[in-house]
């Protein structure tokens, strides 16, 4: 008969683990544990049966029950399928966007294209308002009615999601660095290839901006709401 070891308080039972073991004598059963011999499974040979005029080899019969050993269960790992993100109809290549959050909140930028991850590739240009080539989610931008002709802008195929992937930092530290009191913040050096990519994209956009009179000033001006203005009442 099982021992009724009920709770007397939250997380506290009437008998301790030692008391339960002494009362039920579970240690005796563990000491005198009988190990059952392993069953030797006989190899299954295919059986040949006659059906009418012909003969057929019957394969091994499938097991009636599911395997109890985890190694025998076939793993069904889910395949990661990246679904295509639908872009808003108001966002097209060349659309001027207003960034709503982050480091460049309020800046006006130019949308270049949609990447495979669904994020939008944007640029300031950097020479105009200091916004470099970046990725941004469409939920953090407002699409304006202003559009720039970016048909002459050629974005390299290398500028993709892997282009913006962050480098993995090493977690191991030397003994001197671990015990040092002063921590010098090293300035991250931008690769020459990234600088060249930024210049090639910006030069094509700046050539288009020269043709329009107020576009450069428009992109330089930061967006903000004045007193009495509400974003849902504005036409962008």
Curated annotation (Swiss-Prot):
Cellular component terms, GO, for this chain's entry?
cytosolic large ribosomal subunit; extracellular matrix
GO BP term, pick one:
cytoplasmic translation
Q: Gene3D superfamilies from the xrefs?
A: 2.30.30.30
User: Which key words tag this protein in UniProt?
Assistant: Ribonucleoprotein, Ribosomal protein
Concerning SUPFAM superfamilies, the annotation shows: Translation proteins SH3-like domain
Q: Which InterPro entries match?
A: 60S_ribosomal_eL6, Rib_uL2_dom2, Ribosomal_eL6_CS, Ribosomal_eL6_KOW, Translation_prot_SH3-like_sf
Ribonucleoprotein as UniProt keyword = yes
Top-level lineage group: Eukaryota
The keyword Repressor belongs to this UniProt entry's keyword annotation: no
Q: Which GO terms describe its molecular function?
A: RNA binding; structural constituent of ribosome
Family that this chain belongs to? Belongs to the eukaryotic ribosomal protein eL6 family.
Name by which UniProt lists this protein: Large ribosomal subunit protein eL6
Protein's organism: Dictyostelium discoideum
